[in-house]
């Protein structure tokens, strides 16, 4: 219990450093560019650790975000509406993207996939927009909506039962950030905090044996709360397997 109180106080202090736009309805001025890609999709080796998932999520309309928005990985999976500001070429709606990587260029907060960048254009003006390379934009954080999906965790391919467990947190709905993940250690009657390796990947050396119960420290419109997964990871977990937490974040 003491451990949980200390951890909560720690994250209360950290929260003041998070971008205030996370829960704002206002658009923020910035710049955006796009990266080269042979198939118009994202880099599977992005800093969030999503792999192929990061290429296909949201129909490939994804973005690398600035270090400020990436925020040491807590910004992975955040959703944004981004719209460029060149009236003859830019649509009013812009594009809705998921943050799957980090990176920044000349004053940019977004390095969009080519597909996402083109979606900001009015029909028939995509080539003109691509020719600019970098454009002024405005953006806002919006709720992520994954129809039919609860929060999911995938056992990272480098995990090795029973000595090493790493998980990748996927489908974080709403305007929520995962600040920490803990595993219940039954014999010690305490929660063990997993280390954020990078992005959305958390790991633990020598995890407890048997079924594994996880809980997540979630920051969103409801404040900071621990949410425990009703579904445990089975004792015979294997690398590459995916498990439904039965947690629906909205």
UniProtKB/Swiss-Prot annotation:
Pfam families in alphabetical order:
DPBB_1 (PF03330), Expansin_C (PF01357)
Q: Name one GO biological process term.
A: anatomical structure morphogenesis
Q: Residue limits of the Expansin-like EG45 domain?
A: 45-149
Entry's Gene Ontology cellular component terms: extracellular region
Q: List the disulfide bonds.
A: none
Which superkingdom? Eukaryota
**Which InterPro entries did the record assign?**
Expan_Lol_pI, Expansin/allergen_DPBB_dom, Expansin_CBD, Expansin_CBD_sf, LolPI, RlpA-like_DPBB, RlpA-like_sf
Signal peptide start-end: 1-24
Q: Where in the cell is it found?
A: Secreted
* Keyword terms of this UniProt record: Glycoprotein, Secreted, Signal
Sites carrying a glycan are: 72
Family according to the record = Belongs to the expansin family. Expansin-like B subfamily.
| Protein's name in the database | Expansin-like B1
Q: What is the organism of origin for this protein?
A: Arabidopsis thaliana (Mouse-ear cress)
What is the organism lineage in this UniProt record? Eukaryota, Viridiplantae, Streptophyta, Embryophyta, Tracheophyta
């Amino acid at each position: 219990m003491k451990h949980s109180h200390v951890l909560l106080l720690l994250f209360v202090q950290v929260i003041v450093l998070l971008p205030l736009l996370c829960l704002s309805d206002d658009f923020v001025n910035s710049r955006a560019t796009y990266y080269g890609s042979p198939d118009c999709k994202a880099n599977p080796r992005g800093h969030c650790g999503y792999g192929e998932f990061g290429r296909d999520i949201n129909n490939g309309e994804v973005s690398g975000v600035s270090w400020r928005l990436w925020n040491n990985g807590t910004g992975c999976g955040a959703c944004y509406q981004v719209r460029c500001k060149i009236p003859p070429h830019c649509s009013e709606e812009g594009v809705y993207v998921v943050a799957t990587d980090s990176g920044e260029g000349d004053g940019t907060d977004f390095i969009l996939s080519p597909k996402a960048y083109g979606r900001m254009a009015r029909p028939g003006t995509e080539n003109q927009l691509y020719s600019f390379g970098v454009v002024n934009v405005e953006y806002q954080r919006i709720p992520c909506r994954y129809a039919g999906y609860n929060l999911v965790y995938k056992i990272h391919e480098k995990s090795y039962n029973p000595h090493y467990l790493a998980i990748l947190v996927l489908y974080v709905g709403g305007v929520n950030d995962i600040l920490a993940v803990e595993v219940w250690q039954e014999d010690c009657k305490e929660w063990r905090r997993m280390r954020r390796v990078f992005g959305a990947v958390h790991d633990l050396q020598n995890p407890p044996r048997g079924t594994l119960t996880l809980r997540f420290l979630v920051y969103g419109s409801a404040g900071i709360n621990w949410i425990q997964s009703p579904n445990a990871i089975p004792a015979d977990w294997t690398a590459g397997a995916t498990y439904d937490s039965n947690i629906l974040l909205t």
